[in-house]
Curated annotation (Swiss-Prot):
One of its GO terms (cellular component) is mitochondrion. InterPro entries: Chaperonin_Cpn60_CS, Cpn60/GroEL, Cpn60/GroEL/TCP-1, GroEL-like_apical_dom_sf, GROEL-like_equatorial_sf, TCP-1-like_intermed_sf. Implicated in mitochondrial protein import and macromolecular assembly. May facilitate the correct folding of imported proteins. May also prevent misfolding and promote the refolding and proper assembly of unfolded polypeptides generated under stress conditions in the mitochondrial matrix. Gene3D superfamilies: GroEL, GroEL-like equatorial domain, TCP-1-like chaperonin intermediate domain. It comes from Brassica napus. Belongs to the chaperonin (HSP60) family. This is Chaperonin CPN60, mitochondrial. The keyword Nucleotide-binding applies. Keywords: ATP-binding, Chaperone, Mitochondrion, Nucleotide-binding, Stress response, Transit peptide. SUPFAM superfamilies: GroEL apical domain-like, GroEL equatorial domain-like, GroEL-intermediate domain like. GO terms for molecular function: ATP binding; ATP-dependent protein folding chaperone. Residues 1-32 form a transit peptide.
Length: 587
């Protein structure tokens, strides 16, 4: 019995030792990230510093006398820009609490669906408004105001201003009005505003893309048809050696949903093209090497003008693109799901158009042939409904591209310049101008230069509130609405407070300060106008982010840990041993 108990005790001690060793090893492998917590006034003050420094860098770009900002890049030459979004996105702070505040403001600039991709210069306005609202909010909370009541007052004021802006909106349609909006967002450079011509060419729903040009001048290329971003599968299909393109006049168009591998079915399609004495374009998911070889041999030996391209997109998006192309060209998509195959194909299943040009990178269909206009219209309506129902930004973008190809067309703005830096800076401003004009066409315009927000602040005098803290929240917005005019005037080298005071004395809601000329003018008649959608969304987003920051009571950040310096190489007097200091490159 004693030996049995001794044996059990011995095994227990061994087990405990093993457990202790395992626990020791586990604890040594765990990496705990220590946290730093800042509460109340201290945390908000540090975040405010980050917001203020970011806003100071961004506000100098506000037109018409906006200044350049030079941004150092980790690769290549420094970037020169007058684009507030680009400036905001480039800023990071070593202090993590400051960085938290700045990062929340940058979310306004980085939100693709509302500001960056569709509203252009509104991000700069939003940043300035955020700084003004958050600054006053911090002061009020420090003075003992209830943060949640302030937030309710801010929301009440913003809703009132938005209603006022919408009631004053004027819809635009002429190219001159579109050009005026674009000029403002392009920092006053009229020469950069080619987007109004592009919009005239492709319509409201057309696609306008911006690319680097190859000359010193800006160029506009309009594709009156459908363009897909897929080129020829093989260079053997080239018919024009000079420009390295395959050009097909009055071609037949075969659209196949799957990969083509059957040689006999390929021969059947080629016979149809040969009998009708017409060229042939094949659009398919892919072609097997044997099927591709048959096409190339018939092109080289029999003289049949033929070309094959892969269908654009992936998965369901590729299938949808094929059906769009089929609707436009009058073709049927050959799909095995419906029991269709190439061996039973006839001419009625093939589409046509006036001309197709295929390059290494893309294919352009010009002049629709058998496409049914009613069917095209119905498909456009179907896609519009899908855009409204979609909640995914990516899906919406792809649907808009499809709609543009079906209904409007494609325009390409090629931005020229003497250097890469100049082209990049121009592209930033043209992108802003393009996005602002789209927003203006969508929701209309109001007098620009910040005066629409300034005069809307008068409406807040009449607003009744539930308590004193609500009233302070309304006053915070009222004061913030003056900052765009103040900043524009300050950038022009004049006293902003004087300009704001002079305008508030006026009863003319169209009167504003033309900073470019240094005089008071009727903003609408002078062509200084802003899209309602831009300033509305800028105000709503600025108030939202500022309210979040103002009601923050604790900020939790990671404490950066410095890695242990690497030991010097044996016998190495200097050189490599000094590289151990590279480990401490935390924020």
């Amino acid at each position: 019995m004693y030996r049995l108990i001794s044996s059990i005790a011995s095994k227990a001690r061994v087990a405990r030792n093993c457990t202790s060793q395992i626990g020791s090893r586990l604890s040594s492998t765990r990496n705990y990230a220590a946290k730093d917590i800042r509460f109340g006034v201290e945390g908000r003050a540090l975040m405010l510093r980050g917001v203020e420094e970011l806003a100071d860098a961004v506000k100098v770009t506000i037109p018409p006398k906006g200044r350049n900002v030079i941004i150092e890049q980790s690769w290549g030459a420094p970037k020169v820009t007058k684009d507030g979004v680009t400036v905001a996105k480039s800023i990071e702070f070593k202090d993590r609490v400051k960085n938290v505040g700045a990062s929340l403001v940058k979310q306004v600039a980085n939100r693709p669906t509302q500001l960056n991709r569709c509203l252009g210069d509104g991000t700069t306005c939003a940043t300035v408004l955020t700084r003004a609202i958050f600054t006053e909010g911090c002061k009020s909370v420090a003075a003992g105001m209830n943060a949640m009541d302030l937030r309710r007052g801010i929301k009440l004021a913003v809703d009132t201003v938005v209603t006022k802006l919408k009631s004053r909106a004027r819809m635009i349609s002429t190219s001159e009005e579109i050009a005026q909006v674009g000029t403002i967002s392009a920092n006053g450079d009229r020469e950069l505003v080619t987007d109004c011509k592009a919009m005239e060419s492709v319509g409201k729903e057309g696609v306008i893309t911006i690319q680097d040009g190859k000359t010193l001048f800006n160029e506009l290329e309009v594709v009156e048809g459908m363009k897909i971003d897929r080129g020829y599968i093989s260079p053997y299909f080239i018919t024009n050696q000079k420009n390295q393109k395959c050009e097909l006049e009055d071609p037949l168009i075969l659209i196949h949903e799957k990969k083509i591998s059957n040689l006999n079915s390929m021969v059947k399609v080629l016979e149809l093209a040969l009998k009708s004495q017409r060229s042939l374009l094949i659009v398919a998911a892919d072609l097997e090497s044997d099927a591709l070889a048959v096409l190339i041999l018939n092109k080289l030996r029999a003289g049949i003008k033929v070309c094959a391209v892969k269908a654009p997109g992936f998965g369901e998006n590729r299938k949808a693109n094929m059906h769009d192309l089929a609707t436009l060209t009058g073709a049927q998509v050959i799909t095995e799901e419906l029991g269709m195959n190439l061996e039973k194909i006839d001419l009625s299943m093939l589409g046509n158009c006036k001309k197709i040009t295929v390059s290494k990178d893309d294919t352009v269909f010009l002049g629709w042939g058998a496409g049914d206009k009613k069917a095209i219209g119905e498909r456009c309506e179907q896609i519009r409904s899908m855009v409204e129902a979609s909640e995914s930004d990516y899906d919406k973008e792809k649907l808009q591209e499809r709609l543009a190809k079906l209904s409007g067309g494609v325009a390409v703005l090629k931005i020229g310049g003497a250097s890469e830096s100049e082209v990049g800076e121009k592209k930033d401003r043209v992108t802003d101008a393009l996005n602002a004009t789209k927003a203006a066409v969508e929701e209309g315009i109001v007098p620009g230069g910040g005066v629409a927000l300034l005069y809307a602040s008068k409406e807040l005098d009449k607003l009744s509130t539930a308590n004193f803290d609500h009233k302070i929240g309304v006053q915070i917005i009222q004061n913030a609405l003056k900052t765009p005019v103040y900043t524009i005037a300050s950038n022009a080298g004049v006293e902003g407070a004087v300009i704001v005071g002079k305008l508030l004395e006026s009863d003319n809601p169209d009167l504003g300060y033309d900073a470019a000329k240094g005089e008071y003018v009727d903003m609408v008649k002078s062509g200084i106008i802003d899209p309602v959608k831009v300033i509305r969304t800028a105000l709503v987003d600025a108030a939202s982010v500022s309210s979040l920051l103002t009601t923050t009571e604790a900020v939790v950040t990671e404490i950066p840990t410095k890695e242990d310096a690497s030991p010097a190489m044996g016998g190495g007097g200097g050189g490599m041993g000094g590289m151990g200091g590279m480990g401490g490159m935390g924020f």
